[in-house]
C-alpha cells in the first residue's frame, strides 16, 4: 500500500516539477538574453582599443560582470535566487563563450595573430624572450603557440641582420633586443657620464639586464659595445 501511495504522489508531483523547471529555464534564458548585449558592448569597446587573446577577453568580461553588471538589480536578484552560485556562473560562462566563439569565427579574436603582434611590439621595445613568454602566458596564450610565434619572429628578424643561415636566429634577435633595452635604459656602453660615476655601476647595469630576462652572455655582450653602424638594418 505504501508503494502505491508513493508512486501516486510521485506521479502527481511530476507535472508541477516540470513546470518549475520550465519556468526556471525560461527565466534563465531571459536573463541571458539581457546579459549578452551588455557583454557584446563591452567586448567591442575593448577590442576597439586593445588587441586581445581569447582568454584575456574572457577575463575582461568576467571582471565586467562582477564589477558593473551585478550593480543591476535584475541580475543581482536573479543570482540571489539561485540555491548556489554554480547556476549563475554557468549562465555567465555560456554567454561569454558564445560571444568569444562568434568573434573567433569573425577573426576579431585570434591568439596566433595576437601573439605575433605582441612579440613584434615588445621586441621593438627591447623585451627579452623570457619576458615576452611570461607576458603572453599571463594573457592566456598557450606555451606551444608562444614558442612557435617566437621562433617565426626570430627567423624573420634575423634574416634582415645576417646572411649566414647557420646563425642562431634566437641569439641574433635576443642580442638585438638586449641592445635596444640597454640603449633605452642608458646601460653599459650607452650609459651617460653621470651614470658611470655611480658606485658599482657596471654590476648594477648587468643585474638590470638579467632581471629583464636576458641571459648572462647576451647581457654582457650588449653592455660591452654598441653595434657597428647599420649592422642591425
What are these regions (language model features)?
Residues 1-233:
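An alpha-helical, amphipathic repeat domain used for nucleic-acid recognition
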